[in-house]
Amino acid sequence: MVKCDAFRRLSLGKKENIQMVTHILTTFNRTLAHEDFGKLLLRLAVGGLMLFHGVHKLIDGVEGIAGMLTAQGLPAFIAYGVLVGEVLAPCLIILGIATRPAALVLAFTMIVAWLMVGTGKTWLLDNTGAWAIENLMYFFVGALAVACLGAGRYALGQAQWR
């Protein structure tokens, strides 16, 4: 019985409970309200993950892509556009230099990739039950988000770090 009475004495009233919860939520929101850091994380994720795809093509050469393009009746030199979309644009996105145009280039690259290899898979699931073109969509939507939001404060392309 003593423990319950002690607990009752320590417990706050309804008004104090509401104030305490409001204070906790306000502190939590202030702690996480870093839009520029969120933009940096988005840039690092979208640009960094796409860069893995681009570096692979850079190391192996563009011959494989050029072969796919010529098989579809397109000129092989377009394969170098893949390097722009999967190496140069992600580097610019990561660094925050010309971020919006670079993100639009990346989004366009994903549309071209979908037209080249994904149109037949648009309404299919893969063997794990995931959408067959979900990676393309992640990069496409992520690039559009970067294009809409911009680089934010933590970017080399800013005149100054406000």
Task: Tell me the role of every PLM-derived stretch.
Residues 59-73:
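Membrane-interface interhelical connector segments
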Residues 2-7, 11-56, 76-84, 88-162:
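Extended, low-polarity transmembrane helix blocks
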